[in-house]
A protein has these predicted regions:
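Short, cationic low-complexity segments
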Residues: 273-279
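Composition- and surface-driven signal marking solvent-exposed, interaction-prone regions
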Residues: 243-244, 268-271
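Short acidic N-proximal helix/loop "leader" segments that mark the beginning
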Residues: 1-23
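Acyl-donor binding region in acyl/amide transferases
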Residues: 97-237, 242-255
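Short amphipathic alpha-helix that is part of the acyltransferase structural core
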Residues: 17-101
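Long, contiguous binding/interaction regions
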Residues: 261-269
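Short loop segments at secondary-structure junctions
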Residues: 82-84, 101, 138-139, 259-262
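Short, positively charged
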Residues: 9-16, 48-58, 177, 205-210
């Protein structure tokens, strides 16, 4: 069994100035304790393994936690339902955020297991990997996703992030079953060469599954998972090639977002909150 040591000491140093953002009974904040991170891992286990049917390894099966070595070097964004109280059940949404320094401590970013990140690593600005995004089934809807995006915008502003990236998943492991979605993404949202990470050779799945002229763009967009549609709304690109993730029963694509393309409403909302100005 693999043991992962949890410590929020480094995270507290990075996120001490992050002020919780509220929307009614919900709030978005950074994890500041080991218990916070454990609650995020428990939520991830419920969503990824119990709900979506991912195949757990020995540690996940025994601990009922989705956890790995990257958790210790990441910042964890949490959506909290305050009326539930201070316990782990109050964490209803989460995102894992990894900067260059955290990745250096491990020796790689998480996405490097699927993609050659060379073009992104050569990017001269500050980069941030987004991952392990999930929301409790009872809370899936606009409110929680809006809060998560507001939290990301706040974090980006606080840390001067210039580029975000990370894997996003489509359900299933048959790329031909999602041929229109993959072909649409490749044809309409392929990253420019300077930012075009490519799936590793032994994992590369061509996204051009059909004649681009035969793709109904509107239907393809509607068929995309909400998370990917959200990324596209803030100007996301995709890398070259999809990757089959059989343990998680998904097909992954790499998302790349230049933060100067992020829809202004999130940043402007955060700035208004910081000034104490109502929406």
């Amino acid at each position: 069994m693999t043991a992962y040591r949890l410590s929020a000491t480094k995270s507290r140093g990075r996120t001490a100035d992050f002020r919780e953002l509220r929307a009614g009974k919900l709030g978005v904040r950074m994890a500041s304790t080991a218990a916070d991170i454990d609650a995020a891992q428990a939520l991830r286990y419920r969503v990824f393994y119990e709900e979506m049917g991912a195949a757990p390894g020995p540690d996940a099966a025994s601990s009922h936690r989705d956890r790995d070595e990257f958790d210790a070097v990441a910042d964890h964004l949490l959506v909290v339902d305050h009326p539930i109280g201070p316990g782990p059940e109050s964490v209803v949404g989460t995102y894992r955020l990894i900067q260059r320094g955290g990745a250096a401590a491990i020796g790689r970013f998480y996405s490097a297991d699927e993609y050659d990140l060379g073009p992104l690593l050569r990017f001269p600005g500050r980069i941030l990997e987004l991952g392990r995004s999930c929301v409790d089934a009872r809370y899936r809807g606009r409110a929680v996703m809006q809060l998560l995006w507001r939290g990301i915008a706040a974090y980006v502003a606080q840390h001067g992030i210039d580029l975000m990236f990370g894997c996003a998943s489509l359900a299933g492991t048959d790329p031909d079953a999602i041929a229109s979605e993959l072909t649409y993404l490749y044809g309409h949202h392929l990253a420019p060469p300077a930012l075009r990470a490519r799936a590793l050779p032994d994992r590369y799945v061509d996204m051009r599954r059909m004649d681009p002229l035969a793709v109904d763009a509107r239907r393809a967009i509607l068929a995309l998972p909400p998370l990917i549609k959200g990324y596209l709304r803030v100007g996301a690109f995709v890398g070259d090639g999809a990757v089959i993730d059989r343990p998680f029963n998904t097909t992954d694509v790499l998302i790349v977002v230049k933060t100067d393309l992020v829809t202004a409403k999130y940043t402007k909302h955060y700035e208004r909150q910081s000034r104490g100005t109502p929406d």
